[in-house]
Amino acid sequence: MKLYNDDCLDVLKTIESESVDLVVTDCPYHICSGCCSNDAVKIGRYTEPGGIFQKRKDSHGNTYMTDTKHVSLCGIFNDADPTTYTKQGKLFKFNDIEFSDWLPDIYRVLKSETHCYIMINPRNLKELQQSCEDVGFVFQQLIVWDKGNATPNKYYLNAYELILMLRKGKAMNINNMGTKNILRVPNIIKTKQHPTEKPYELMKILIENSSNEGQIVLDPFMGVGATGVAAKKNGQRVHRHRNR
């Protein structure tokens, strides 16, 4: 197992081309927690309400797009004074990383006839899939992770997340062809060490289906390391990177 405690955008460029057998990762994307959504608009890559970054105006009428470089964020910061909180909320780290910053290198380091799994939410799915296809990936399947629990809100409870399954080169069968595309794995609740931590059992299914013992699994955004634990227990070699 190799663990790189460094900026994945730098480390990826040092990995040899076509040296990785599988990528499984939960990448950063533009979202926050605790945000309002009353005046969201669709401007380019910034899409629906509910925590997604929005086009805003400051107290002088100047329009800007909220992101991690501007601390102003809908529902969290006051427009007149961007340093003042108006309600509780938090901005997830590394939201300034674009898909185009790392996907070309992911495609480059993967061998031909391999799979890539990327966790994503519904609002960012379209952009991620397009970005993946732009660098050469072929869409294989959309997998649903049924978390089995959800946080109450005013709409239907959000009890699932999506996993975009891609391939490089020709299609390759998964090892357990009886696996359904709805994976019912309970989410981590009480023992969670990271806001977006994924269960070991979920990573285990993906790794066992798309790689074999001794092969190299890459996770450029390792979080608490569930991908690495699953790969190591299954006999694969793993490269894990921590985000900047």
Indicate residue ranges for each PLM-predicted region.
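S-adenosyl-L-methionine-dependent nucleic acid methyltransferase catalytic domains
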Residues: 1-149, 154, 158, 165, ...
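Short loop segments at secondary-structure junctions
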Residues: 167-171
